[in-house]
Amino acid sequence: YALLNIGVIFVLSIFVSLFLNSIRRAMIFMNIFYFCMSLVFYYVYLFRGEAFQLIDLYSIATAADVVGGYKFEITGEIVTSFITMMLVVRLWLQSREYRFARKTRNKILLRVAAAALMLGTYLAYMNLNWNAEFGVISDLWNPAKTYRQYGTTVGFTAVAKYMRLTPPDGLSLIHISEPTRPY
């Protein structure tokens, strides 16, 4: 499953590279993004005892209200990760810049193609049974178990696939308000 985790990160890196029109900027962004996400995953698990899930973004306002009550301690691992991330970013800053497109028209076409590719990937992600094909079984009652078994990236995407907020079939506002009309 390590290769599958790396594959997901690689695909995300390609999308970011196409949108930013630069491998160097994309790699800098991805390094900072993954460091920040590792902090989110760490602190959510530390404070709540449960893994961070995509659905948690819906309750971000509540999290912002209660975050002041927690004590954030910076561990040696966090410091080491931060220093490593900054060294990698520094290496990327010294690397040669490579752009996929130089003219404005080509940049726009590149981003439209990247958006179409992302849409196609999202539709495949949601509608194909990719997780069963790779043997990934999502434990929706205990996402942390899924993360531990298959890796954080694959576990997060597998659990997020089933965490969509969709209304039940046949349910509408009219059906809900009908039983309450006589009262």
Residue ranges, per PLM feature:
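Intrinsic-disorder/low-complexity, polar/charged segments
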Residues: 22, 171-173
